[in-house]
């Protein structure tokens, strides 16, 4: 059999990246609303640009929320605290344009209304979940390391270890795979915003020593590994001053870094009646439990819905030939073990809680935090029993 030898690349962005600022604002608003009224319907979009934040969307709720206060608190936590950056929490304008959810949509997702009496999906669409056994977190290594690099950048910035860093940054990790197993880090790219006066040499040395070498396992690097740190040579103008940021523009960063497929729907700013979010979380839960149970080495799950209809119109499982039993049988087990109706997903994963701001930076998947219920592997025993392994 021919040996498979290839390089796969994934990227991540920090909490200070303009698109991620927008995601975090949208999810901070969602959390504030769910705290008061868990049954709220929220579709909250955010735009950030030089000196301005715009919040718009369709929100039906009994909650009373101070939108500008939430926006400013979120921006402050991220670290935009100086008007010299062209965007800061104290002086930026905050504009809001909030309507209510369309009654035509509402009747399809409210139990007892619409053509079908169960709580239906909030929209049509297809969602994917993915897991693989190349890391303990059952995530692809390239996206996992990319997330950890930008999280470390934020940590050393906020702690003062590298006090010349500013909030906006990106990472990219290229990994050599041989026969589908990660064996070597080929290239690490990091671009981080910084203060104007610091030298390039200081930036490069600081990031390699305090970030890259603290995150990338030593055994995966050698003399051939390339480090490209701020490869333009200068990154002073950044954040919303450098680029306009929008909610939902980093869907591959949010999911699996290019591994597996993506249905196209973003997560942030959406309450869990929106299957773009809740069914994608459920897809991860299903795929992770299948891999953890040993049914396969990698797994992609697709689920699709029609608006207003509770039962998914299709469920597909693809193990890329790594399954110990046929994929059709695995899909049947998924149907038997997991209830994929929207209300059941919300109940199983306990999604009517203010947990979403934490998801909005450094990945929705692969972080085993208490709030991330979709990362649990509590279905392993019943899956193995049904599979007979």
From Swiss-Prot:
Record-level GO cellular component terms: cytoplasm
Membrane-traversing stretches: none
Binding sites annotated in the UniProt record for Mg(2+): 19
Residues annotated as binding K(+): 45
Chain intervals for the UniProt region annotation (Flexible loop): 101-111
Cofactor binding note from Swiss-Prot or TrEMBL: Binds 2 divalent ions per subunit.
Record keywords: ATP-binding, Cytoplasm, Magnesium, Metal-binding, Nucleotide-binding, One-carbon metabolism, Potassium, Transferase
One MF annotation (Gene Ontology) recorded for this entry: magnesium ion binding
Binding positions (L-methionine): 58, 101, 243, 274
CDD domains membership: S-AdoMet_synt
Reaction(s) this enzyme catalyzes, per UniProt: L-methionine + ATP + H2O = S-adenosyl-L-methionine + phosphate + diphosphate
InterPro entries in alphabetical order: ADOMET_SYNTHASE_CS, S-AdoMet_synt_C, S-AdoMet_synt_central, S-AdoMet_synt_N, S-AdoMet_synthetase, S-AdoMet_synthetase_sfam
Amino acids binding ATP: 17, 168-170, 234-235, 243, 249-250, 266, 270
Cofactor section: Mg(2+); K(+)
Pathway assigned in UniProt: Amino-acid biosynthesis; S-adenosyl-L-methionine biosynthesis; S-adenosyl-L-methionine from L-methionine: step 1/1
Record localization: Cytoplasm
Enzyme Commission designation: 2.5.1.6
Cited NCBIfam families: metK
Membership in a protein family: Belongs to the AdoMet synthase family.
Function summary: Catalyzes the formation of S-adenosylmethionine (AdoMet) from methionine and ATP. The overall synthetic reaction is composed of two sequential steps, AdoMet formation and the subsequent tripolyphosphate hydrolysis which occurs prior to release of AdoMet from the enzyme.
Quaternary structure annotation from Swiss-Prot or TrEMBL: Homotetramer; dimer of dimers.
Protein name: S-adenosylmethionine synthase
Classification lineage: Bacteria, Pseudomonadati, Thermodesulfobacteriota, Desulfuromonadia, Geobacterales
Gene: metK
């Amino acid at each position: 059999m021919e040996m498979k030898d290839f390089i796969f690349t994934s990227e991540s962005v920090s909490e200070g990246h303009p698109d991620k600022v927008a995601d975090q604002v949208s999810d901070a608003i969602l959390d504030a609303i769910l705290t008061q009224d868990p049954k709220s319907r929220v579709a909250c979009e955010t735009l950030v640009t030089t000196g301005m934040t715009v919040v718009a969307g369709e929100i039906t709720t009994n909650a009373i929320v101070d939108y500008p206060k939430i926006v400013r608190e979120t921006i402050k936590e991220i670290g935009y605290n100086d008007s010299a950056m062209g965007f800061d929490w104290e002086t930026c304008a905050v504009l809001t344009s909030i309507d209510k959810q369309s009654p035509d949509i509402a009747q399809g997702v409210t139990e007892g209304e619409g053509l079908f009496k169960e709580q239906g999906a909030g929209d049509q669409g297809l969602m994917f979940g993915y897991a693989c056994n190349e890391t303990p977190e059952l995530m692809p290594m390239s996206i996992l390391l990319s997330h950890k690099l930008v999280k470390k950048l934020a940590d050393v910035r906020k702690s003062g270890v590298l006090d010349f860093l500013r909030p906006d940054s990106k990472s990219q990790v290229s990994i050599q795979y041989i026969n589908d197993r990660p064996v070597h880090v080929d290239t690490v790219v990091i671009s981080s915003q910084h203060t104007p006066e610091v030298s390039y040499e200081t930036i490069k040395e600081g990031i390699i020593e305090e970030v890259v070498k603290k995150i990338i396992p030593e055994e995966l690097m050698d003399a051939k590994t390339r480090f490209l740190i701020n490869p333009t040579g200068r990154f002073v103008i950044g954040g919303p001053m450098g680029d306009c940021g929008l909610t939902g523009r980093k869907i591959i960063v949010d999911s699996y870094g290019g591994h597996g497929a993506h249905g196209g729907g973003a997560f942030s700013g959406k309450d869990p009646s929106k299957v773009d979010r809740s069914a994608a979380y459920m897809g991860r839960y299903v795929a992770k439990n299948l891999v953890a149970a040993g049914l396969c080495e990698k797994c992609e799950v697709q689920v699709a819905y029609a608006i207003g209809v509770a039962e998914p119109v299709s469920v597909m499982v693809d193990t890329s030939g790594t399954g110990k039993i046929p994929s059709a049988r695995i899909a049947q087990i998924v149907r038997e073990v997991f209830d994929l109706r929207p209300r059941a997903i919300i109940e199983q994963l306990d999604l009517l809680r203010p947990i979403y701001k934490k998801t909005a930076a450094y990945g929705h998947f692969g972080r085993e935090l208490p709030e991330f219920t979709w990362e649990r592997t509590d279905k392993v025993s019943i899956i193995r029993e049904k599979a007979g392994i």
